[in-house]
Amino acid sequence: MDCVFCAIAGNRQPAYRICEDEHFIVLLDIFPLRPAHVLIVSREHAPFLKDLSVAARDRLLELSERVAAALRTLGHGHEGINLLINDGPASNQHVPHLHLHLIPRRSGDLLPLAWRALTRFLPLGRARIEARLQAHAERLRSALMVADQHV
């Protein structure tokens, strides 16, 4: 049985896709810790960072910088963005498939972040969250297209 990220990569599972390339799919986390919480998901099924190809590892940081710039353009993460890889089960990796979290932060958001970390998998307010995810995905896709035109 495929993991959820393999199913997304194979177009067998829907996702709020932002962009993709030969190595990664950029999408919104469906259980976001903060607004515009993005995942960069490997197309390769690689449970650990060391399992990624060298080409994919090289591309990961470049792509994360591009996505972080788009987030900041849209007003997310001006004060900071957590870049997080949970590398293996003991690191709280919920899906055993390499993915990088980009979590926009701002001063004083620790309490709401902690609350969301505790409640993020509960079905509370899912319709509202889904609407927000769709809006964030559209805005991020547009921001990345504009940025690509200026390169």
Where are the regions a protein language model picked out?
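HIT superfamily nucleotide-processing domains
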Residues: M1-V151
